[in-house]
């Protein structure tokens, strides 16, 4: 029986994040992914992302989050689009939109030491062709395929 059928509903809370795939500056077709511990204690490889702060626009938030979670400085190449999903958090239903960008590394080095929330436990470079086998979430795997398609057209 659904919540609606039972006469109960949880408040739906909209949430926005921005992040993306950062191409390595060495010219290889590798992107930086962060590792987060899942509930089972295993590492899930994910696209770095987070919430805009203050007056930040989506692009600024994505660049800042990349720096915090990966240690990399980056510039945006192209907007890859958005993904939408919902999940439960306590008594709320979070309705999340994540804005993804393809970026190019302009400086920095891989480290999770700058992540203020300490969500990332690892960061590594991964070959773009292996993203389908690496990324933990299907919606991010779809975005990874979009990166491959975009690069193939260039």
Show which residues each predicted segment covers.
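C-terminal alpha-helix
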Residues: 146-154
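N-terminal strand-loop-strand
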Residues: 2-47
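Residue-level marker of positions within ordered structural domains that often coincide
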Residues: 25, 106, 149
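Unchanged
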Residues: 52-142
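A short, polar/proline- and glycine-enriched secondary-structure boundary/capping micro-motif
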Residues: 42-46, 121-124, 145
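Charged/polar positions on well-ordered alpha helices
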Residues: 21-22, 64, 146
